[in-house]
């Protein structure tokens, strides 16, 4: 790969970059996963642990991934090739970039299907389909959607085509223009819904649930879940922030932008939690009802409440915007790689990759109906297998390698140039990057893959390997 394969695109302003990166981070995880895992793990105590994990694990990797992208000046694969050469590191570090590009593309192949559910629900809500609906009606609607391959494939196709259309137009004409409309719209809708939440009569209960910690309800599994979600929610390890960082001019501060990204992502998750739990509690429903919270519990609430058609439609518009803004960032690393390294123009690259992702996505769409009895990894469906490999292997591995490279392989002067900080902040950042972040990721990584009776052994072996790498690195 040539050193000359550098990013020619750039963001028009730091504000647009922050909006795009926030759009990448704010997705279904904020509106779907965060509320239900908070509900399942006791509320306030879980939120407190989650915020600590964002600070100690998420932000160091966020800074590092953006810095590697800008210092490498290219897509994740080429950026790591450039950085390995410039810093005297092994050529194998290019695998970090390849892992991110593949992870993003694979996640998008099932993300478009799940995002399609939200588009379907937005349309159904707009038509008044959830007005006065009861729990049986919602359950039947959701089951009918999942049982229909044609419906799932239609919505999957719609989301895929939209995503590729935007990305094919480029950074300024496509992603920037879409984000400039979508992110302010998302924030406005969220604030309108928050205003409504204060009138439900359950806002105080919702606030107490989210922010009053009860540590008696906090388990070790809840801590692991908080650590894992803090890592995944910021869109780390899929190459999105690395390629977005490569478009960031040197005059803009990564540290300042990174803090805004982390703050905005966390704020959206917490505000969405306040909105969702206010509506759930006001209707006497359960906060810890799993993934069905978004697609089964909330439609019941909207169906029963005054103004439910309007606020339900607004809510699902919010979900659609969050899903689409993340979808664009998941494929951008691969499109940029095709364009810069393989000489395939952006428009052609986007549609070629879109076709491949659409084909893989068919497996996910069929996993809920025709292929529900077809198993790949153990007893997992095609969708569950893809989700398991990306979420439990590829993303943690990517995050771990980003932390290791930024902490030990990147020259200190390069790190200081990209991430200028005060001495105290720099020391805290480097300590977290070298020790806290890798150890936390190793623990989460192992807990997701290994049976509990072998967990401590695997963690000990993994930490010994990491310690060996550090010792060898210091000797050189």
Where are these regions (language model features)?
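Transmembrane helix-boundary motif of multi-pass solute transporters/channels
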Residues: 16-53, 239-245, 255-259, 263-264, ...
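Helix-loop-helix connectors at the membrane interface of multi-pass transporters/channels
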Residues: 2-8, 115-147, 247-251, 256, ...
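Membrane-embedded translocation segments of transport machinery
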Residues: 2-7, 11-13, 176, 180-324, ...
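Inter-helical loop and helix-membrane interface segments of multi-pass membrane transporters/permeases
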Residues: 5-10, 37-41, 71-99, 112-168, ...
